[in-house]
Amino acid sequence: PPEDELRKFIGPPLQEQFMKCCEIEEKEAAEMVGLYREYYQEKGIFDNWVYEGVMEMLKTLKEAGLTIVMATSKPEKFAKMIAEHFGFAKYFDLIGGACMNGARTKKQEVIQYVLGQCEEKDLEKIRMVGDRCYDIEGANREGIRAIGVLYGYERRTGGSGS
């Protein structure tokens, strides 16, 4: 499929996106997610990169004494492997992601999980940085200020998801 079609699968829960885009039932979508994850774990997991300036930013924030956590829609297991592989896990106090069993798949659920694990409870001191509309919407639903970035997959839509 064309790249713009594949981009629709980045961000939202995969099973929901398969059902929507492929017009299939839940069971078939779950099977497709399983097949995708098999491929991803073997071949696709490290087929990405760290954007320029991100490592330096993480280092600066960590040296300033900030607590840095990750809330990703990617399965937590994969997120931790990627963070280790690319050398930025050391900057994070917590890496939280989706559950492989489907119990925590929506961005808001991941954010709730991460917030529950954080020592900081004052939402005024917490910021969500994201490159997809799902990041911004999830943060807004939890009462967290969000910072949208344009270097990721959302491109120049301003986080609208359009």
What is each residue range found by the language model?
Residues 1-5, 26-28, 90-94, 122-126:
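Short acidic capping loops at alpha-helix termini that bridge into adjacent secondary structure
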